[in-house]
UniProtKB/Swiss-Prot annotation:
It catalyses: S-sulfanyl-L-cysteinyl-[protein] + uridine(34) in tRNA + AH2 + ATP = 2-thiouridine(34) in tRNA + L-cysteinyl-[protein] + A + AMP + diphosphate + H(+). Pfam families: tRNA_Me_trans, tRNA_Me_trans_C, tRNA_Me_trans_M. CDD domains: MnmA_TRMU-like. Residues 143-145, 298-299 are annotated as: Interaction with tRNA. Disulfide bonds join 94-193. The active site is at 94 (nucleophile), 193 (cysteine persulfide intermediate). ATP binds at residues 7-14, 33, 119. This is tRNA-specific 2-thiouridylase MnmA. GO terms for cellular component: cytoplasm.
Length: 349
């Protein structure tokens, strides 16, 4: 019998992934990561629901204490990033360093299993020509989570199954109801678990970063107002600036040295290019010459065509056809060829 370890968060997606694989005849083992210290009530509730699902399906359930790993790789990563004036993307970092890698290691070393599954909406296939595992967008483009998975290694992809990649969210809800799973009507969770646990990113960050008043200035350096800490802002932000102006203003830069938030009108808020570093090439080998790709710079943004120009030190330059709004240092730029995720990295300016 095929054995698979399913990462269970206590939500409907991972519950259905486990139920479907169990129904297909797999020997399923549930695995839940205990991620957050202190106020992480979403995780404690999730662990209870995950345990209930495993009992309902009649499968074993393991809980792994990953709080120190999460603190080192995600909490500290976020805090240091916001202090430096960037807006880190914790989910891709978490998937590689906290979830998929450690889960695979635990499955192999403790459970004698070389495959894991999760409830992510994405697809994996092996390409015989390139001899690489390719990562593809989910059939349900509205739920596609491939953007957050760009940093997975070939080894991780080889050992991972995404049972939900070929179905819609509506299919998932229907299947959950058919199996009478406790999580069938559970509300959708936040994309970022830290926000769910703490109420807002501001509340979370204020526990770690001292609020330091500084100036909000325009592109010429004119002081327009005051802020209570640059970590409260992100590139492209319009609401909550507290600045009176004849036209809407947007955050275009955060300067940790001068402790300034720089703002501009929409016409001056776009950029024609950016640099991307810490690249991970997934479905293709790293290109040595410029290529044409579609690039997604935020999870909910549309992919836009760009010229990708390889640079030294595992970096590329992206040149946009038109100035792009909201290019944010610390976020991921993920490259696609249609439905195939080619690779991605972290945005620099």
């Amino acid at each position: 019998m095929n054995k698979v370890v399913v990462g269970l968060s206590g939500g409907v997606d991972s519950s259905v992934a486990a139920a479907v694989l169990h129904h297909q005849g797999y020997e399923v083992i549930g695995l839940t990561l205990w991620l957050m210290k202190g106020k992480g009530q979403c995780c404690s509730e999730g662990m209870v629901d995950a345990a209930f699902i495993c009992e309902q399906l009649g499968i074993p359930h393991h809980i792994v204490d990953s709080r120190d790993v999460f603190q080192a790789n995600i909490v500290n990563y976020l805090v240091s990033g916001y202090e430096a004036g960037i807006t880190p993307l914790p989910c891709s970092q978490c998937n590689r360093a906290v979830k998929f890698g450690p889960m695979l290691n635990y499955a192999r070393q403790e459970l004698g299993c070389d495959r894991i599954a999760t409830g992510h909406y994405a697809r994996i296939r092996y390409d015989e020509i390139s001899q690489r595992y390719q990562l593809l967008r989910a059939i349900d483009r509205n739920k596609d989570q491939s953007y957050f998975l760009y940093d997975l290694s070939q080894e991780m992809l080889a050992g991972t199954v995404f049972p939900l990649g070929d179905q819609t969210k509506e299919d998932t809800r229907r299947i959950a109801a058919e199996f009478d799973l406790k999580t069938a009507s559970k509300p959708e969770s936040q994309d970022l678990c830290l926000i769910e646990a703490h109420g807002s990113m501001k509340t979370f960050l204020d526990q770690y970063i001292h609020q330091k008043e500084g100036d909000i200035v325009d592109l010429e350096g004119k002081v327009l107002g005051k802020h209570q800490g640059i970590h409260h802002y992100t590139i492209g932000q319009r609401k909550g600036l507290g600045v009176a102006a004849p036209e809407p203003l947007y955050v275009v830069k955060l300067d940790p040295i001068m402790n300034q938030v720089i703002v501009a009108n929409r016409a001056n808020a776009g950029r024609s290019d950016c640099t991307v570093t810490r690249l991970n090439w997934v479905s293709i080998a790293a290109p040595s010459t410029p290529i044409r790709v579609e690039t997604q710079i935020r999870y909910r943004s549309s992919a836009v065509p760009v010229d990708l120009i390889p640079l030294e030190d595992n970096r590329v330059k992206l040149v946009f056809d038109e100035p792009e709004f909201g290019i944010t240092p610390g976020q991921a730029a993920v490259f696609y060829d249609g439905e195939i995720l080619l690779g991605g990295g972290i945005i620099e300016l």
